Amino acid sequence: MSEMTPREIVHELDSHIIGQDKAKRSVAIALRNRWRRMQLAPELRTEVTPKNILMIGPTGVGKTEIARRLAKLANAPFIKVEATKFTEVGYVGKEVESIIRDLTDVAIKMTHQQAVEKVKFRAEEHAEDRILDILLPPARDAWGNNEEGDNDSGTRQSFRKKLREGKLDDKEIEVDVAAPQVGVEIMAPPGMEEMTNQLQGMFQNLSGGNTTKKRKMKIVDALKALTEEEGAKLVNPEELKEQAIFNVENHGIVFIDEIDKICKGSNSHSGDVSREGVQRDLLPLVEGSTVSTKHGMVKTDHMLFITSGAFQMAKPSDLIPELQGRLPIRVELEALTANDFKRILTEPNASLTEQYIALLATENVKVEFTEDGISRIAESAFQVNETTENIGARRLHTVMERLMEEISYDASEKNGESLIVDAEYVSSRLGELVADEDLSRFIL
């Protein structure tokens, strides 16, 4: 798991997300508290439960982006789900317990990758030996047994050196690799994923276990395939499963987006009975319960839950009281201003303007955005958000695509030319659309 301090986490988030300091601080503290808890004595550790977070803010202000970036920083099992994908037990659709099953699968895969990475050097050596045995078969006696001899002779060492330098990469060899397991596609009703997984596992076991298959491939591809195969042999599956379940129980993070969509608004009179039921099904997970997965029983007592929603049609108080009580940290994200849009266009790593400059540079077209041009783009996006539907920073993608449409289309014929995107150019491309509310409603 990540050992970054809250200040380091916020600094990292700042390089991708503009503003929203309160939300960044909250998730940074929550992430650091995961590390702090693991430093405690075991008796006290079991008593410390995570403080779950509810992020409230209009669409397009950075809620989902914070989750995406946090997943990369956490170095822990992390899953992001949409609350609207789930239904109450008994209705057609996915049950909320599948969140924990999917998170456990993520943890198994992550732990396996880390374990294989630790033995990578040994696995590469074993893979090299197998390839060298194909290139330089050992001498055999009259009965077909390998003769004892100087197997690591000068010739073998010479070939090993060439192999490591990549001089043999394009040579083709026939190699025995593990045959892919035969997948059995089973169509099951929604909510029956666990039963489907068990049936698939049973059929795979019946199909003959570990079999090998001769394949002709380049040495560079063979080395990669054999390294993976040898790495898998060097890790203990039982230890790996045990470690993965420990990781998911103590470090797992669940991000639930669009939680406002499963609220029953105060003025709602629809017959959609399964909405509040989803909240009731979520409650045991957030409170702490034990979920059965194909890898074993997983406890959710110490998982961190981060939820978010726009809450335009409902209020946080429309959540059932028990769930509200389990989301003690409330963070309100602010709507973006024209100045925020200007910063979004230039400050983050791989900003939108950088992306367009790099894309068109592949066609040898030089694009330059001036200060006043960027200001005009930001003002245009902000104005359209104000007069039509406010979709936050996502409006910048629409505006930029419209602005760069002509040069993107003609770029292949304008090899070596330059384009300066200033306020005048932006006005000529977007002015009429921004001014006409009906046009901007449909086009921007």
Swiss-Prot record:
Major place of residence: cytoplasm
MF (Gene Ontology): ATP binding; ATP hydrolysis activity; peptidase activity; proteasome-activating activity
Keyword hit for Cytoplasm: yes
Region described as Disordered: spans on this chain: 141-161
Taxon lineage: Bacteria, Pseudomonadati, Pseudomonadota, Gammaproteobacteria, Vibrionales
SUPFAM superfamilies from the UniProt entry: P-loop containing nucleoside triphosphate hydrolases
Family: Belongs to the ClpX chaperone family. HslU subfamily.
One example of a Gene Ontology biological process annotation: proteolysis involved in protein catabolic process
Subunit structure and binding partners: A double ring-shaped homohexamer of HslV is capped on each side by a ring-shaped HslU homohexamer. The assembly of the HslU/HslV complex is dependent on binding of ATP.
GO terms under cellular component: HslUV protease complex
Annotated InterPro entries: AAA+_ATPase, ATP-dep_Clp_protease_ClpX, ATPase_AAA_core, Clp_ATPase_C, HslU, P-loop_NTPase
Gene: hslU
Disulfide-bond pairs as recorded: none
Protein name: ATP-dependent protease ATPase subunit HslU
Domain of life of the organism encoding this protein: Bacteria
Pfam families noted in UniProt: AAA (PF00004), AAA_2 (PF07724)
Keyword Cytoplasm: yes
Localization, UniProt: Cytoplasm
Binding positions (ATP): 18, 60-65, 257, 322, 394
UniProt cross-references to HAMAP family, sorted A to Z: HslU
The entry's keywords: ATP-binding, Chaperone, Cytoplasm, Nucleotide-binding, Stress response
Function statement: ATPase subunit of a proteasome-like degradation complex; this subunit has chaperone activity. The binding of ATP and its subsequent hydrolysis by HslU are essential for unfolding of protein substrates subsequently hydrolyzed by HslV. HslU recognizes the N-terminal part of its protein substrates and unfolds these before they are guided to HslV for hydrolysis.
